[in-house]
Amino acid sequence: IGAAALVVGQYYMKQINGELSEMNSKISKLVDFQMAEYKGKVLTLMTQVKRASEFQTEILEDNNLRNEEIQRLQGLETTCMDLLNQANVTISDLSSKEGESFEKYDKLMSEVAIWQKYQGALTEVLYIIADLNYTLHLGAISKEQCYAAYSDMYDMENNLIDKLRKWHEFHKKKFKIDVDQARMERQGIDAVIHKPLELISEKWKYRNIGKEAVT
């Protein structure tokens, strides 16, 4: 291995190691006991990917170890894509549901938000795996080949973002949500009860829903 290639490889490995440590910390803080098994698989994946960046010198300097690590990364890439697909499918399913009330819509949003955190972390891990793969090949294969899986998933997630945007727009109109003021028009019996108070102030026409519900 050329000295320049080794130095560059070690530099990228250190960067990757730091990124994974930060991501691991964020995922560890997510609390959802119903998703404990899924969370465990995500954390295990991160730990396994992190290993490649921790033993950077040994792996890069030994061709046998390097080839073994490349094979191992292929398996981790498949695992990452499986977990990411699960997150994407769940987000897609949730955003196909209509909230019958604002409370039910708010609950759906909370579920989507949790899955989006996993989605974001796993997308980063997939990118890091591509980075590692490219680094370990020392330029022997093209970037396009190394990042192919990441590119496919990235395109899929962009389509999902568009679906989510339309889903939020639908509910924004349905519940007459004012995003800027973090409020919505009262509906049903709530609107009837507060109707007389609207003569005093227009503010009684609305109910506050909190900034977290519209961000």
Task: Enumerate the language-model features and the residues they cover.
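Membrane-inserting effector segments that mediate pore formation, membrane fusion
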Residues: 1-32, 193-215
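Amphipathic, membrane-active segments
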Residues: 6-64
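Long, helix-rich, hydrophobic modules that act as membrane-proximal anchors or helical bundle/coiled-coil regulators
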Residues: 45-48, 52, 58-59, 64-215
